[in-house]
Amino acid sequence: MRRYAAVFGILALFGVSVLSGCSTPSEAETTGGRTISTVVLTPPPPPNDLTDEQVAQITTVQCPDVITEETVRALVQPQADAAEFFASTAQCGDIAAVVAAGEGAPAFVSPLQYVEAPCPAGTLFTIWAHYDDDLIFGSPTIPDALDAGQCVRTLYLTGSDAGMGLGYGYGREDGLRAAYDVILNAPLEWEQRTVTLTNGLTLAISRPIGDPRVTLFFLRLPDGGLGAGGFPATGMTSLPQLLAGKIRELHMIDTGEAVSLDGISSTVVELYNAYQPQTVMAHLPGSAQGTSGDHPDHQVTGDIVMRTADSGQVDPAKVIYAQGYPSEAHPQNLEGDVLQRKLDAFAVYASHDPVIPCSTADTCLNVNRFGGWLVRQYLVPHTEIVRP
């Protein structure tokens, strides 16, 4: 010990102060002819860049009693970004999930990162025009993904109202939930909620309680009909008109919220970024060969997804398209248990849709055109579509 004391004494003699810990930089002071260096300790930077004003806004104005100032200041940057977004969009109830994410929270790209449970086995993201399109043209791909343990996240662009009002569309939504109960092989209780995305649009969500594998998103835009011109009940507006630039926006048939073409595209991209799916499936684009005679809403839905892939916002290698009405011209390629499961799910759905005159697998198989579509599924990768 005397040796170390002597060393420190010598250092002190030469005007060097010895301090423990990390420090930056030194300040020199001359006293009595001796120069003494004083180390200035710099406090660590805060974990996020929220200003005092932003913190106060979150904790006292937007979401009082939900999160404390101390907790907000302790959030790492991705959590702080998410908390600020949820607070600014009046979605305070989801902030608890942000706090629970801890320091390993990923960069914030969408509230869906916290609204939804993670899917370790991967995700299939599908985009359709109408409520039965996934059951007809997306099957058996969707049931197969669920059997493999993957999650399925499905976005429906229209309210599937066929000009018959919200009640008809809501009934079809009930049919979807019943059909997915069959696919999941369990009667489930479903919860309904909404989420406001980073593009400002609010989506309706339906998902089974206790089973995170399925989530259905409803944009509820006007059904365009087979003539592509829409219906009087929804102002004679449609997706084809929007894509063609004939109108600037559509309005959700339930809330009246305005939605532009960019709004639809950014919704697709946000869901894609939130879920990072292994596969994206949609209708075959109208600008590709093989869609002549398909429903105009189908064609436009495919075109919107195709544009996101062409622009690189969605990985083209992950995108596949399902042929719609024209698939009936191809040979039947589904049979046995695979076909039976598809028919059983569709029949349950159809029992909620008064336009489709069937409620059993056998009777649905005999419905004009529907039977032909149900016994087939034809898929085309994005990299193989043929454009005229």
What kind of region is each of these model predictions?
Residues 268-286:
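Proline-aspartate-enriched helix->loop->beta-strand connector
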Residues 326-353:
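PAPS-dependent sulfotransferase catalytic core
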Residues 296-304:
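Charged helix-capping and loop-helix junction motifs
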